[in-house]
Structures are given as C-alpha cells and as structure tokens.
C-alpha cells in the first residue's frame, strides 16, 4: 500500500527489479489512497443517512469495505475464463460492437426520435473511429473528450490492465504470458473503447440538441454529465462498486463471471420502464425497442427470463399430470418456416447461421434464474445434472467441458476432446 511504502522503503527481491509492476503498483496504490481520502467521509455520511433499515445500512458497510479492499477474488480465474471463452475472438469483437445499437439506441430514443438517435450513433461511431485512428481528440469535442479519457469514462479497461500488471508475478515466463494475454485481449479492449467513445459523442450531440434547460430539468449540470450517464447506463460499469456484495465474495466471484452484462441489461430495462409518462420520456417504448433489437439476434427464445418462465410452466403442468414441451408444441403449430426465424432470431437465422455463426447463444439471456427446471419430474438424469450445474455459470461450464473432454480422451477420441474444449 501507499502507507507501507512511505513508512518502510525496502526493496523486495524479484519485485523491485520488475519495473512495470513497480510503476503499476505505485500508480494504483496512490490512486486508491487518494480516492479513499477524498471520498471516505462522503461515503460514511451517505451510509449514515440511509433510512431504509439496519439491514440495508449493514449491506452498505459491506460494500464500502469491498470497494476499499484492493484484493480481487479469483482474479486469475476470471482472467482465464475470459481468455478461454472470448480472448482473441474476432467474432466477439464484432458482436461487442452491436452494443451501442442494442442498448444505447433504445436509451436515447426516450428523448429523441429513433431516427435521430440512430443518426447520432452512426455519426458518433465515425468520429470515434477517426479519433482512435489519429490518436487525438475529435474537433469540436476536445474538452469533453479529453475529460472523459482522463476520468476513465471511455477507457476504463486501462485501470483493469494496470491492476493486472500490479498483481502479476515476475520472471521471463510471466512476462511472456503477459504479452500473450495482452494480445488476446486487444480485440475486446479496442472494441470496448470504440463503443464507449461512439456512445459518448452521440450522447453529447443529443444533449446539445436538447439544450441546457432540458438538461437541468433532467438533473444534469451539463452535456458532459448526460453523456457520461449514458455511457454508464448502456455500456455498463464493471468495477467493484457496481457488483453485488455476494459477487465480491470468494464463493460468489467465480459463479458470477460474465453475469454482470445480463444484470446491467435487465436493470436498464427496469429503469426505463419505471419512467413516469409525465416526465416526457418514452421509457416503455424504449423497452419494447430494446427487446425487439435483442429478438432480432437471439429470437424469442433469447429474451430475458423466457426459459425460466417456460421451465416453471412446464414443471407445473408435469405435476398436474399434463407434461408438455411448450417450445416444441409452438414450433409444430407455427411450422418450420415461421418458427425458426421467430424463435432463433431473424438476423441469426437468415444471415449469421448461413455464415456458420450462432449469435443466439452469445446474445440471448433466457435462463437467468438457476435451477428453474430442477423440480420437473420429466427431466432426464443428465438434464437434472446439467440443471444443477447451471448455477456454476462460466466456471461450471468450463468444468463441464473439461469433464466431457476427459471422457473423449478415455475413449481414445482426442479430436473430439479438443473440439469440446
């Protein structure tokens, strides 16, 4: 920590020779200490002002300790799962670049017509691309853009990368591994930065068009504040402060890998749906647009909670003596030509499947509640095992893949084992 370094300046063998790690540790520890000194009193006052009851206040104190504690539970495991599932994937990069249209477009459509929101995002994407290519702030946006870069609004991944260097180990092998992991994460890093910069510029344009009076009415002091809020709401905040307390525990951390995106997605829909009509914001229309955008890629069977709803319905029907597979019956009733694009997604069915890609499994979030089908009496033994394993998320999925691969190896089928992994 910064305090330890000030009290006792002592070289540590191996550590002190690793210049990158020393500098990263210096920057991050001082940043944490400075932030704590600046915000600790304000955080304490906010907690003391909570009037929702002792349990809420207790959870707030737990969150405070989680944020102040620099330790990241299972950081290496989460890093491995990212590299294994998404690292170096061009397909993931292209899919990631749909996020401004999947989430930001509906958000901005609350305030301006859909056509205007679309044009703002397209223009923002063009300007952001040029800015990243030239390495300079876009003309006309210099002050806001440079501030957003400085405050980590559009490049938050740099903080996570510095934290990774700080936690790293020394030695040539670890240096080589660091180069590999950095290279594999470049696609995600570049596309994430591009998304945020495009959204930031698009939101600035919308805010400037609406004017200062409108911004004040909505609770924003400036166009910058509105743009920052738009980035946070639609591109996600992935730091420790925005995770549940359970996700910061040793048990919850490995189980919640890759869950934050779906949580952010559902929370955004809830926020928009709760907008009062008197506010002038078309929140409910934005929710339907958001669901339509998702359905175009993942189909009806990829919408949030849809599988959980079907699981509960089918379990209830089975206990009443009328077992049924609702999706299968619906497909039979509609016919293949109509059911496939409707259930699998129009774009997924007509475009991506023909290219050998499956967008539905990457974008859909139908099974958000674990064990929703666990009590179904018609479930097979393997289906029940899979249902209970679903709580493990990406971690459990990797373990399951490893087990399946070992079974193929035991039967001498190394090729299938490799494909399974």
Residue ranges and their predicted role:
Residues 258, 395, 399-402:
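Hydrophobic, well-ordered secondary-structure elements that form the walls
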Residues 261, 265, 349, 362, 404-421, ...:
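Hydrophobic alpha-helical segments
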Residues 60-63, 399, 418:
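Composition-driven recognition of long, low-complexity, acid-poor segments enriched in small hydrophobic
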Residues 3-343:
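Hydrophobic, often aromatic-rich secondary-structure segments at membrane interfaces
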Residues 305-392:
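Glycine-enriched catalytic-core subsegment of oxygenase/oxidase enzymes
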């Amino acid at each position: 920590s910064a305090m330890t370094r000030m009290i006792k300046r002592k070289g540590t063998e191996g550590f002190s020779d690793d210049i990158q790690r020393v500098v990263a540790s210096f920057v991050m520890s001082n940043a944490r200490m400075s932030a704590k000194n600046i915000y600790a009193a304000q955080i304490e006052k906010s907690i003391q002002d909570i009037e929702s009851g002792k349990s809420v206040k207790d959870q707030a104190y737990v969150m405070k300790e989680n944020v102040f504690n620099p330790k990241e539970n299972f950081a290496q495991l989460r890093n491995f799962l990212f590299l294994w599932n998404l690292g170096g994937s061009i397909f993931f990069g292209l899919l990631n670049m749909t996020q401004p249209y999947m989430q930001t477009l509906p958000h901005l459509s609350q305030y301006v017509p859909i056509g205007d929101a679309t044009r703002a995002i397209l223009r923002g994407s063009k300007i952001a691309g040029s800015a990243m290519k030239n390495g300079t702030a876009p003309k006309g946006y210099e002050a806001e853009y440079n501030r957003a870069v400085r405050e980590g609004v559009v490049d938050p991944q740099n903080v996570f990368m510095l934290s990774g260097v700080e936690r790293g180990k020394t030695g040539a092998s670890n240096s080589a591994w660091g180069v590999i992991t950095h290279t594999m994460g470049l696609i995600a890093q570049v596309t994430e930065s591009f998304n945020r910069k495009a959204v930031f510029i698009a939101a600035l344009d919308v805010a400037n068009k609406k004017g200062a009076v409108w911004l004040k009415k909505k609770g924003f002091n400036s166009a910058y504040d509105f743009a920052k809020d738009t980035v946070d709401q639609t591109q996600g905040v992935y730091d420790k402060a925005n995770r549940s307390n359970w996700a910061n525990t040793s048990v919850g951390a490995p189980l919640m890998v890759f869950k934050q995106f779906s949580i952010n997605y559902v929370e955004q829909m809830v926020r928009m749906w709760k907008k009062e009509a008197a506010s002038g914001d078309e929140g409910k229309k934005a929710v339907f647009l958001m669901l339509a955008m998702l359905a175009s890629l993942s189909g009806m069977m990829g919408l949030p909670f849809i599988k959980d709803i079907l699981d509960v319905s089918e379990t209830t029907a089975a206990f009443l003596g009328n077992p049924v597979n609702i999706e299968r019956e619906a497909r039979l009733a509609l016919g293949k030509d109509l059911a496939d694009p409707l259930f699998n997604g129009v774009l997924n069915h007509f475009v991506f499947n023909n290219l050998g890609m499956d967008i539905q499994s990457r974008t859909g979030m139908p099974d958000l509640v674990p064990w929703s089908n666990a009590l179904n009496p018609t479930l097979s033994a393997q289906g029940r095992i899979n249902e209970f394993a679903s709580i493990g998320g990406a971690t459990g999925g990797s373990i399951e893949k490893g087990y399946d691969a070992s079974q193929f190896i035991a039967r001498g089928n190394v090729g299938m084992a490799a494909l399974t992994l």
